[in-house]
Amino acid sequence: MIDHAHLRLFQFCDSQFPTGAFSHSFGLETYIQRDTVHDEESFQQWLVLFLNEQLTYADGLTMRLVYDALNENDTKAILKLDRILFVQNLPKETRQGSKQMGNRMVKLASELYDSDWINWYHAQMKDKKASLHPAICFTMLGHHLGVDIETIIDYYLYQNVSSLTQNAVRAIPLGQTAGQRIVHKMIPIMKETRDHIMTIPASQLGITAPGLEINQMEHENVNVRIFIS
């Protein structure tokens, strides 16, 4: 039997869901312009790196910690994690891009669901106490729907992999079949990533690959662009 709570959460993974993810490459466009990423194989290598670094030690670990804080009704911990996610995201474009996507996701979630936590998170932004991050909002929504944290992380990783793959299909370019082949190959890697996220200590929050951050910073100066970040 289909779990409708899971389907409701999966709605937010749809590539047509208007969070603005289609406008952000999170540094991928810099790699493409330098011809470091130029085909199916090189893009998948980049995607695995992004998954195993930024989506693991920033978004993914934060989601696990936020879920625990929600269960403990620890608002201070959630605001601290929101702040850490914002300030440790050094490249300006990716920092602002995440904030923009978080704002859109929170507003859409508020329209669709009457969640005390999401309404509270939105209010914290209005009071300038939170920046709003999509990873935190997604976790709050999954928690509201009664979905376990492992599944919430699975869906969030899938949403990012799917969105970035569609952006690569446009930018490299790749064929749609190649894009689906990449997503198919990434599914077992996503499971490994989620399993790793569930074991790493909170002290490792924010670890990332310098090369990713440098290329995200340098995207500000690319001559021709189709993405905001």
From Swiss-Prot:
Keywords of this entry: Chaperone, Cytoplasm, Nickel insertion
GO molecular function annotations of the record: nickel cation binding
InterPro entries, per database record: UreF, UreF_sf
Phylogenetic placement of the source organism: Bacteria, Bacillati, Bacillota, Bacilli, Bacillales
Record flagged with keyword Chaperone: yes
Subcellular location(s) per record: Cytoplasm
Role, per record: Required for maturation of urease via the functional incorporation of the urease nickel metallocenter.
One annotated Gene Ontology cellular component of this protein: cytoplasm
Subunit structure: UreD, UreF and UreG form a complex that acts as a GTP-hydrolysis-dependent molecular chaperone, activating the urease apoprotein by helping to assemble the nickel containing metallocenter of UreC. The UreE protein probably delivers the nickel.
Protein name stated in the entry: Urease accessory protein UreF
Similarity remark: Belongs to the UreF family.
Principal location listed in the UniProt entry: cytoplasm
PANTHER family: UREASE ACCESSORY PROTEIN F
Record flagged with keyword Lipoprotein: no
